[in-house]
Amino acid sequence: MALAHTLGFPRIGRDRELKKAQEAFWKGELDEAGLRAVGRQLRAAHWQVQKDAGIQLLPVGDFAWYDQVLTHSLTFGVIPERFRAHGEAGPTLHTLFGMARGVSDDSCCGGAHAQEMTKWFDTNYHYLVPEFSADQQFQLSWEQLFEEVDEARALGHQVKPVLIGPLTYLWLGKAKGAEFDRLDLLDRLLPLYGQIFRRLAGQGVEWVQIDEPILVLDLPQAWKNAFERAYNLLQSEPLKKLVATYFGGLEDNLGLAANLPVDGLHIDLVRAPEQYPSILDRLPAYKVVSLGLVNGRNVWRCDLEKALEVVRHARERLGERLWVAPSCSLLHSPVDLEREDGLDAELKSWLAFAVQKCREVAVLARAATEPEAAEVLAALEESRAVQASRASSPRIHKPAVQARLAAIKASDAQRRSPFAERIARQRAGLDLPAFPTTTIGSFPQTSSIRLARQSFKQGKLSEAEYIEAMHSEIRHAVQIQEQLGLDVLVHGEAERNDMVEYFAEQLDGYVFTRFGWVQSYGSRCVKPAVIYGDLSRPRAMTVEWIRYAQSLTDKVMKGMLTGPVTMLMWSFPREDVSREVQARQLALAIRDEVVDLEAAGIRIVQIDEAAFREGLPLRRNAWPHYLEWATEAFRLCASGVRDETQIHTHMCYSEFNDVIESIAAMDADVITIETSRSDMELLEAFEQFDYPNEIGPGVYDIHSPRVPSREEIVALLRKAARRIPAERLWVNPDCGLKTRAWPETEAALVNMVAAARELRGDLARG
């Protein structure tokens, strides 16, 4: 039969045991021995559950105490000087967690900021960015991989250690200090891979998986050349080597990947099914091909019949050289569907989490040589029933939603008048001062707010009691904003647990799991909502809260919504329709809410698109199509209102240059952005492009409890006013204030309002 394997398994545990142990360790409630015991138990359980599901070659090295890239940094001795405890023989778990979370001033290292964290390709997982110096030296400094191989082999498992490849590891890092080419470090790094391979061979390992996902990116020629050189050098080292690619197609790197002097190649046929015939034609006859046929990034069951067509064809061409796997590591999938006890039977039958995906992989591998086996036939029959159910279910397919989608006209995604005409009407109606002050939406989520929400969900608070509790929080937020002298107020979002979940709970077509947790980073786990069907809004979602807030003040109250692209990017999407279609459905639902807010007397509506840039495809040639439908979805949700109603959007990331035209195409009247940490340098993109609409550059960093002085904010605003005309500038924090405490929030806003008033004085004096 074909060989069944996985590229990695979720490390958090069925009940998030790793998260609980990490946090107990950080609080001093669990010692290192206790933490390590939890790790051993989880690894043993995860290997066994994969083996029981039919996986023949088990991944080792996919477990990490915080993040797999960080584990590699410790393994290679890539530890910034600020985390090196002098006198210690080598790195410890305290070193690892210090690199991830920072070190307080009273520790042995005297205080050190954490390493930068960023998204792992186009997933919602985050990794710790390696920091390289020009004189970087590499040395094996962390024994975790070898210890875990011994653990797994002692339990009787056939193992396949997993390593991030040398080129991907260097690509993911950043040069610190003097500028230099990271490829200059390759010759220093490669000997460590040789050492690792030799040690693994000595432990009885036969195969090693080397992850090189950057092969699905647009690579400079120098990096392509480096692949050939690196793997030619590694060719002489022991072990059979499987190079794993995922998250996309190899495209122009296909020939390079196919001809690397290794023993096998894994390809993602979920994201890029079209690459299958070319790979088979280009691959040398001695190589194993691992086909990623089960989606490792989503929660839907595999269409086994469709996947089996590929397996049968591959079996004829490859014989014993065929392996079957998920498309990528199952790190991005929840752990076990069997934990779900609140889903109805039909919906649950459509889903598969990591454990179930292992079984699907095993069935496909077995079907290659035993197509008539009872287990295979039963699984195929069940899969056919699931696909038929999903194809015809009225829960999924809503004629009214589809008819509305089909009726969309180009004019529906355009405001009635150009910005210049709209802004004149808005300024006349809103009557705001120069440098108007506002916040991004949320105010501190106190323990009393969280307790009230939890008590209401558990039935301990009646609806009337819950509404009064939230009204009390809204009154408090409005009162403070009026006392501070803010110009445009918000209601504070006390009733919202999460900017996606709050809306998803109120839309038809979404479902929530109880245990569908996935790791975002470290101990942070998220439970994305699942889009299972056509999306619509049965009733207003925010209107009563905002209407109540507006009734408390004569000042302008801003409505707060999450945009369609962000809703989509932070959910598990459908696989049976495109992301574009799902974004349009979400846009129509949000459009209805915007129109209802306007009808309720709300004159400013903010539609947050925090994930707009995150949705960009990995390959540049796919950007134009994404940007076209993403900007259209925003305009569609924002264009149902009169010219007098002002539409804001908020984006929180640090790179605008390459998407500035698309941001302008969204045609929001005001965009608020995160700029304080870049000292307003981000505004250069808006200045050079001559961005036409109004801008609120964030004037202080909400991620820090530090209160900025009035003078600091004045300096930033003056810097901004040199790039953007003063009449188009707003004054606001970088982001929402949900995670801050009230004292620091009030202190910072006092200084922000004072700074805006000083700028108005400058303007008046000319």
Swiss-Prot record:
Q: Which residues bind L-methionine?
A: I440, G441, S442, E493, D608
Report the record's Gene Ontology biological process terms: methionine biosynthetic process; methylation
**A Pfam family per the record:** Meth_synt_1
Co-factor remark: Binds 1 zinc ion per subunit.
List its EC numbers.
2.1.1.14
Q: Provide the binding site for 5-methyltetrahydropteroyltri-L-glutamate.
A: R16, E17, L18, K19, K119, R524, C525, W570, E614
* Lineage: superkingdom: Bacteria
Q: Does the keyword Protease apply?
A: no
Chemical reaction(s) catalysed: 5-methyltetrahydropteroyltri-L-glutamate + L-homocysteine = tetrahydropteroyltri-L-glutamate + L-methionine
What parts of the sequence cross the membrane? none
Key words, A-Z: Amino-acid biosynthesis, Metal-binding, Methionine biosynthesis, Methyltransferase, Repeat, Transferase, Zinc
Where do the catalytic residues lie?
H703
List residues binding Zn(2+). Answer: H650, C652, E674, C735
What is its cofactor?
A: Zn(2+)
Q: Where does L-homocysteine bind?
A: I440, G441, S442, E493, D608
Keyword Amino-acid biosynthesis belongs to the record: yes
Pathway listed for it is: Amino-acid biosynthesis; L-methionine biosynthesis via de novo pathway; L-methionine from L-homocysteine (MetE route): step 1/1
**InterPro entries found in the cross-reference section:** Cbl-indep_Met_Synth_N, Cobalamin-indep_Met_synthase, Met_Synth_C/arc, UROD/MetE-like_sf
Entry's Gene Ontology molecular function annotations: 5-methyltetrahydropteroyltriglutamate-homocysteine S-methyltransferase activity; zinc ion binding
Gene3D superfamilies, A to Z: 3.20.20.210
Q: Briefly, what is this protein's role?
A: Catalyzes the transfer of a methyl group from 5-methyltetrahydrofolate to homocysteine resulting in methionine formation.
Q: Name the family the entry cites.
A: Belongs to the vitamin-B12 independent methionine synthase family.
Recorded protein name is 5-methyltetrahydropteroyltriglutamate--homocysteine methyltransferase
Taxonomic lineage of the native organism: Bacteria, Pseudomonadati, Pseudomonadota, Gammaproteobacteria, Pseudomonadales
